[in-house]
């Protein structure tokens, strides 16, 4: 059966519209979890103020030189802030991916599903999802740091990995290997969606300053919720493509 991107876009839009309230609640809950965890594990404002102290950072040409010029205390604060941001983001993303994929599964099986039920149903796969997202995020970001194209390519070929892990109960490495083969064979369907998702995420970061009127925590929840909705839309599209390929 020939699969057209247009028909998949239409199916994705219909599902997203019909389940919008549930998806919005999942996105909002995951955003709240991300912000709360980030706030709980981040250094205090007093500790963060250390990063702006002293003249040792002036004239640093790049990130690596900036870190090298920091005092050990400043490096420790920066490391803790980065670790808190990374950990909270990974947990939020894992819950989002698990919740959305289980929502799709349950709705497709004819069940009425709430946001909490979808997230609760995803609990058994969350540890594996967390590790999978950690590995894939690391690979994609390393590719982005070296040269942009390898990072984008890795994001494309690993796109089906979370779906295979949840839908087919695969292991982490098995899902990554299978995703690479399947996504590469269906590049015309996967690549535009992933590139569109990356562009949308980038634009959201560029317009993040528009939320400056809100308090920092509220602004962070709003931005994360919008980002989660974009990711949920991509997951629905990829799940639909995957099921059509399998059939």
Swiss-Prot record:
- Key word Cell membrane present: yes
Q: Where is the protein situated, by its record's location annotation? A: Cell inner membrane
Cellular component, GO, one term: plasma membrane
- UniProt superkingdom: Bacteria
UniProt-listed InterPro entries: UPF0259
Which sequence ranges are marked TM in the entry?
20-40, 87-107, 119-139, 146-166, 189-209, 219-239
Task: List S-S links within the chain.
Answer: none
User: Which family does the record assign?
Assistant: Belongs to the UPF0259 family.
The protein's name: UPF0259 membrane protein KPN78578_12180
């Amino acid at each position: 059966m020939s699969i057209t991107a247009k028909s998949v876009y239409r199916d994705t839009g219909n599902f997203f519209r019909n389940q919008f309230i549930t998806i919005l609640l999942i996105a909002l809950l995951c955003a709240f979890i991300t912000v709360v965890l980030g706030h709980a594990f981040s250094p205090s404002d007093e500790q963060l103020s250390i990063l702006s102290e002293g003249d040792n950072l002036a004239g640093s040409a790049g990130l690596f030189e900036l870190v090298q010029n920091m005092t050990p205390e400043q490096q420790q604060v920066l490391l803790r802030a980065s670790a808190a941001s990374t950990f909270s983001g990974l947990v939020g993303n894992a819950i989002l991916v698990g919740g959305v994929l289980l929502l799709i599964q349950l709705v497709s099986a004819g069940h009425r599903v709430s946001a909490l039920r979808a997230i609760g149903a995803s609990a058994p796969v969350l540890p594996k999802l967390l590790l999978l997202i950690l590995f894939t995020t690391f690979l994609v970001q390393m590719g982005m740091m070296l040269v942009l194209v390898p990072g984008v390519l890795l994001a494309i070929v690993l796109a089906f990995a979370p779906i295979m892990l949840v839908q087919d109960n695969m292991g982490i490495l098995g899902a990554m290997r299978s995703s690479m083969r399947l996504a590469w064979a269906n590049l015309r369907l996967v690549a535009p969606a992933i590139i569109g998702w990356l562009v949308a995420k980038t634009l959201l970061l560029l317009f993040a300053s528009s939320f400056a009127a809100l308090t920092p925590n509220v602004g962070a929840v709003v931005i994360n919720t919008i980002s989660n909705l974009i990711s949920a839309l991509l997951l629905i599209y990829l799940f639909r493509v995957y099921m059509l390929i399998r059939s």
